[in-house]
Amino acid sequence: MKITVISPHRGDAAFALGLSIRAWLEEGHAVEVVSCFTRSEFAPYSDVGSVHKNDRVSFVTAVRKREDEAWRKQAGTAKFTITDLNLKDAPLRLHVGASEVFGRAAEASEKVVAKIKRALEMSKAGAWVLPLGLGGHVDHVTARDVALSARPGEGFPVAFYEELPEGIGVAADEPVQAAVVSLTLAVQSKLEPVFAAGVEDVEGAVAKKRRVAWCYDSQIDEAATLEIAEACRKFEGRERIWANEGWRGAGL
């Protein structure tokens, strides 16, 4: 089966699902990550500060594209692909500051809707994995809601991943449950926690997850890579996703 993952920005799917995607590939599935809002000026750990303001979008967009490519090469299989929709991220699209992108309702222009829906249609996937929307980032909520509106039917296999680092720690438990309850109503199916991989050597899982996170070193520092990698300890070296009945029935 082909599984398509919606990643609002480059790195979101990698941080949350690096181990799961590896497990799906090892089980023989094809995986496509659709990176949506990829035109950006946000790369705090790059040299963007030395670039003229008129060139920052092209500079950052190119840097982050190389990071997606690094992850794809690390996976080492033709069954793993990454599709770039080249949409502007929220600060560029909505003309707001970086601190103003949270807690906003989904805001999707006709272009955004058309590109995301078209990508999902062209993927011809048998299952989708979408962000929960933890933290309320408008790009995450928008990508998720547009994808949900494009579902082929209520029984279509769909699952939701917990974004990182938003989903880390006890403080995240309540937002996770709130998102699950809300999305249960949206998909008209009970969402239950599932894991793509079986229990494995936890230290090995942490190391694998950290290697994936480090592909995106313009976005995060060493402390963040550790935080993201260590998150899988909570689930015995795995990543939790929330799946509808269609997903569970497909045995994914």
Residue ranges and their predicted role:
Residues 6, 10, 61, 109, ...:
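Aromatic-acidic/polar surface patches that form glycan- and anion
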Residues 112-120, 125-153, 158-164:
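Hydrophobic, aromatic-enriched interface-forming segments
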Residues 12-13, 40, 135-138, 168:
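Active-site environment of divalent metal-dependent phosphoester hydrolases
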Residues 14-16, 144, 167:
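Hydrophobic positions within alpha-helical membrane elements
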Residues 11, 68, 128, 139, ...:
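Divalent metal-coordination and catalytic microenvironments
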Residues 1-113, 117-118, 122, 149-156:
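Active-site rim/loop-helix segments in enzyme catalytic domains that contact anionic ligands
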Residues 27, 66-85, 92, 96-100, ...:
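The feature marks non-catalytic terminal segments
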Residues 3, 54, 102, 129, ...:
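Residues at structural and domain junctions
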